[in-house]
From Swiss-Prot:
Alphabetical list of Gene3D superfamilies matching this protein: P-loop containing nucleotide triphosphate hydrolases, Probable tRNA modification gtpase trme, domain 1, tRNA modification GTPase MnmE domain 2
Compartment(s) of residence: Mitochondrion
Protein residues bound to Mg(2+): S263, T284
Record organism: Mus musculus
NCBIfam families assigned to the protein according to its UniProt record, in alphabetical order: mnmE_trmE_thdF (TIGR00450), PRK05291.1-3 (NF003661), small_GTP (TIGR00231)
Transit peptide: 1-20
Protein name, as recorded: 5-taurinomethyluridine-[tRNA] synthase subunit GTPB3, mitochondrial
Tissue expression as described in the entry: Ubiquitously expressed. Highly expressed in tissues with high metabolic rates including heart, liver and brain. Weakly expressed in skeletal muscle.
Positions of K(+) binding: N259
Source organism phylogeny: Eukaryota, Metazoa, Chordata, Craniata, Vertebrata
Entry cofactors: K(+)
Binding site for 5,10-methylenetetrahydrofolate: R52, E112, K152, K492
PROSITE patterns in the cross-refs: G_TRME
């Protein structure tokens, strides 16, 4: 091994990658000097309300409201009487916690007041804090923005925190926690180290290519590193749609011939009367949507008009809209009447909808289909077997609820395939921004492979590394940061 190559690789590994926000010039420019305060718990009456401060005057705020000459022990709750700093009027008996920086959420001196949650108490304490010199009300997301500015959170971790606050299903919560714990940031840091190593090899060859002591195969080693990284990035980009579906919800469309029980199924899955149920065919004429938590996954569930021909103009428009919605579906629940499988409408649905979808579903990227035979409670035990060849299906009765457990288990499997399973596998890309920067990194690696000059190849690797840097928050523009932090509430 060439005597200087390992040293060069080590030096490059410690070069200003700026993957962590605390090393980023743009993050440093965000570090504020003022002290902020806000109600961090929910609005309205509650047993306990949490009011927090962050900034250099937090200690002054604590002394002003408690008359303490010295702060209490760090990170230990102490019961204190709060008084207005101007009038001395008692406000509340409160638990106070002192978090000296940099060992705090924001990296600054912080105080938390755990007060009784009545509106008058909360209002009184906020007014008292507003009278302390150097304190001002916080803006939306400002506490988290300060944590980012002080390197406590990377940008992907900030997004994970925002997703955790908005999470409505178990799958969303699991994914948000993984991102908040830094799994995506750590993955990007690993990729960046690979790029740094490859760049060190290329730059070593540029600087010492004619040195007899340079180890043979240096460029080949760089090529191997880049090819392995291209495979990893390509795999994550192919799965990017899953992460976005986990964040926004999978499109599940219920379809079938008239009177098969589609609306009953939608009402059963959503556990509320979304659709009108009637024995009259063609009752549903428009697409009805409702957000649902199915098996822990977010879903946009759509009820559609029964598919048939030769009906009035209004219903025909409903059929057209139903077919259009089918094209947008991630998962299709095809519903047939188990007691009427030989009817022309059932046979037509099998031929024109189910068979093409099954052929398409052989492709892993195609739409997914679950065929359901509803009204199984109407089947007689002594009835002759149906001679129609049916694809794999589930028996179901929306009337009695029979078969619902099997349906929910099958839906869980299909939804995990569409949205990804946040309990296993690598972290998902939940934002378009993630996909954009990873694609930019992959494009730069493509330029590296095509480069005819080593200087251009090295610049392509630097550009790839910059894209990873932007993903985790280094060198991010103010506009992008503003867009991300505006999703937070005041006090977070």
């Amino acid at each position: 091994m060439w005597r200087g190559l390992s040293a060069l690789v080590t030096q490059a590994a410690w070069a200003p990658l700026r993957l962590c926000a605390r090393c980023s010039t743009s993050a440093e420019s965000l570090v504020p000097s003022s002290t902020i305060f806000a109600l961090s718990s929910g609005q309205g009456r509650c047993a306990i309300a949490v009011i927090r401060t962050s900034g250099p005057a937090s200690g002054l705020a604590l002394r002003s409201l408690t008359a303490l000459q010295e702060p209490p022990p760090a990170r230990r709750a102490c019961l204190r009487l709060l008084r207005h700093p101007c009038s001395g009027e008692p406000l509340d008996r409160s638990l106070v916690l002192w978090f000296p920086g940099p060992q705090s959420f924001t990296g600054e001196d912080c105080v938390e007041f755990h007060v009784h949650g009545g509106p008058a108490v909360v209002s009184g304490v906020l007014q008292a804090l507003g009278s302390v010199p150097g304190l001002r009300p916080a803006e939306a997301g400002e506490f988290t923005r300060r944590a980012f500015a002080h390197g406590k959170l990377s940008l992907t971790e900030v997004e994970g925190l925002a997703d955790l606050i908005r999470a409505e299903t178990e799958a969303q919560r699991r994914q948000a926690l993984r991102q908040l714990d830094g799994e995506l940031s750590q993955l990007c840091q690993g990729w960046a180290k690979t790029l740094t190593k490859a760049l060190a090899y290329v730059e070593a060859y540029i600087d010492f290519g004619e040195d007899d002591n340079l180890e043979e195969g240096v460029l080949e080693q760089a090529d191997r590193e880049v090819r392995a990284l291209e495979v990893a990035l390509g795999s994550h980009l192919r799965d990017a749609r899953r992460g976005q579906r986990l964040l926004s919800g999978a499109n599940v469309v219920v379809t079938g011939p008239p009177n098969a029980g589609k609306s009953s199924l939608v009402n059963l899955l959503s556990q509320k009367p979304v659709s009108i149920v009637s024995p009259e065919p063609g009752t549903t004429r428009d697409v009805l949507e409702t957000p649902v938590d199915l098996a822990g996954f977010p879903v946009l569930l759509s009820d559609t008009a029964g598919l048939r021909e030769g009906v009035g103009a209004v219903e025909q428009e409903g059929v057209r809209r139903a077919r259009h919605r089918l094209e947008q579906a991630d998962i299709i629940l095809g519903v047939l009447d188990a007691s009427d499988l030989a009817s022309s409408s059932s046979c037509s649905f099998l031929d024109t909808v189910v068979t093409p979808l099954l052929a398409q579903s052989q492709d892993s990227g195609g739409q997914r289909l679950l065929l359901l035979l509803n009204k199984s409670d109407l089947l007689s035990a002594n009835a002759p077997a149906c001679d129609i060849a049916l694809p794999p299906h589930l028996l179901l009765s929306c009337h009695t609820g029979a078969g619902m457990d099997s349906l929910l288990q099958a839906l869980k499997t299909e939804l995990a395939a569409v949205c990804g399973d946040p309990s296993t596998g690598p972290p998902l890309l939940t934002r378009v921004r993630h996909q954009y920067h990873l694609q930019g990194c992959l494009d730069a690696l493509g330029h590296y492979q095509l480069a005819t000059d080593l200087a251009l190849a090295a610049e392509a690797l630097r550009q790839a590394r910059r894209q990873l840097n932007h993903l985790t928050g280094g060198g991010g523009t103010e506009e992008i940061l503003d867009l991300i932090f505006q999703d937070f509430c005041v006090g977070k």
